[in-house]
């Protein structure tokens, strides 16, 4: 019996249910050593056990390697952004952005999206019955939820890299007018910082509901290094994010594929 094979057997949701069902007690139920010893498991050959273990190890290795790459790269990005505040004067972004108010009147855009406070587009919580009034966010534009009340002390803003989509008519949409001065991804990295969340909340106005309006967005100040430096920082971030995504996919696959392999071994 391979210890790692046994560990993978224990990781299965089926074993969680088995252990819960076979726990005994009144105020506190326990899965005793005796219950553990009475657990029945299928025992394929050690070679078959090792095949499953090797697949699990491969996914875990991919996950750990890419996590090790992503962490320092993310730290480099953050440190660069911090340094920029001291090296370059802060400038308002107003002269370089333009508000967009294109409505989906002909229903040509069918993809409806919301925006999470994690700064990404997501499936909407609800879709308007009359989507003709929804605003269109074109590829390369920014969308944001003007309302900052009851939003986890954050502002929901995202940069659209996928296909054109629509958002609620209550949202704001804008684009950068000169990408030779501001790299869109660089601006997105800046507004994704916790410091910007605090700034947006502080500058929001209203009574029962507070809003961060477009005129306040125009007054946001950021350091503007040469475009080559902005793009270099963005490229580092993209490398870090790619490594992070690979790690997450490997982790997800290890949770999906390995139980399936184990199930195959059990029933073969």
Segments the model singles out, each with a brief description of its role:
Residues 94-130, 144, 162:
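DNA target-recognition patches
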Residues 1-4, 24-47, 165-170, 205-231:
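A short glycine-rich beta-alpha junction/loop motif
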Residues 38-104, 223-268:
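Non-catalytic DNA-recognition/assembly elements of restriction-modification systems
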Residues 11-14, 101, 148, 192, ...:
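Hydrophobic alpha-helix feature that most strongly marks membrane-spanning transmembrane helices
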Residues 15-18, 196-199:
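Periplasmic-binding protein-like
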Residues 1-11, 139, 143-192:
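A short beta-sheet element
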Residues 21-23, 106-113, 202-204:
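Short coil/turn segments at secondary-structure boundaries
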């Amino acid at each position: 019996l391979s210890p790692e094979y046994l560990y993978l057997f224990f990781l299965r949701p089926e074993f969680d249910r088995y252990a819960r069902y076979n726990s005994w007690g009144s105020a506190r139920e326990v899965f005793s050593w005796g219950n553990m010893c009475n657990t029945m498991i299928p025992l394929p050959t050690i070679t078959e056990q090792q095949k499953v273990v090797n697949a699990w190890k491969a996914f875990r290795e991919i996950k750990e390697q890419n996590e090790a790459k992503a962490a320092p790269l993310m730290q480099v990005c953050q440190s660069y952004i911090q340094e920029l505040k001291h090296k370059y004067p802060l400038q308002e972004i107003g002269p370089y952005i333009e508000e967009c108010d294109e409505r989906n009147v002909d229903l040509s855009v069918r993809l409806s999206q919301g925006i999470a406070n994690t700064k990404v587009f997501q499936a909407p919580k609800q879709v308007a019955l009359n989507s003709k009034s929804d605003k269109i966010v074109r590829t390369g534009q920014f969308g944001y939820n003007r309302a900052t009340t009851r939003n986890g002390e954050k502002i929901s803003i995202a940069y659209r890299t996928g296909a054109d989509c629509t958002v609620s008519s209550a949202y704001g949409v804008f684009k950068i007018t000169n990408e030779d001065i501001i790299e869109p991804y660089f601006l997105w990295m800046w507004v994704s910082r916790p410091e910007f969340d605090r700034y947006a909340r502080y500058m929001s106005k209203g009574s029962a509901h507070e809003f961060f309006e477009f005129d306040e967005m125009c007054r946001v100040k950021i350091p503007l290094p040469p475009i080559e430096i902005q793009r270099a920082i963005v490229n580092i971030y993209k490398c870090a994010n790619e490594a992070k995504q690979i790690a997450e996919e490997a982790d997800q696959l290890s949770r999906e594929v390995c139980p399936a392999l184990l199930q195959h071994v059990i029933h073969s």
